[in-house]
C-alpha cells in the first residue's frame, strides 16, 4: 500500500465534518468506495490524540472522532 493509494487527508476531513465529526471505517467505505483496509489505514494515519482520537462504541465499533468538528 502506497500513500498515493490512500484518500487525500482533506477528503477525509470533509467527510468527517459532514458527518458531525465522528466516523467509522464503514462510513469511509460508503462515502468514497475504498476497501476496508484502505479506509482503516486512512483513518489510523490521522490519529494524533489531539485533533483526531479513537473511541470504542458500546457495541465495539471503533469510532474516529475529529474533535474540531464535534459539538459545533
Regions found by a protein language model. Name each.
Residues 1-72:
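Long, charge-rich, low-complexity intrinsically disordered regions
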Amino acid at each position: 500500500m502506497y500513500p498515493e493509494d490512500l484518500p487525500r487527508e482533506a477528503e477525509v476531513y470533509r467527510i468527517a465534518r459532514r458527518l458531525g465529526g465522528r466516523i467509522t471505517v464503514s462510513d469511509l467505505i460508503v462515502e468514497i468506495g475504498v476497501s476496508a483496509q484502505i479506509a482503516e489505514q486512512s483513518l489510523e494515519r490521522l490519529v494524533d490524540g489531539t485533533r483526531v482520537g479513537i473511541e470504542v462504541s458500546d457495541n465495539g465499533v471503533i469510532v474516529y472522532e475529529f474533535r474540531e468538528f464535534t459539538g459545533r
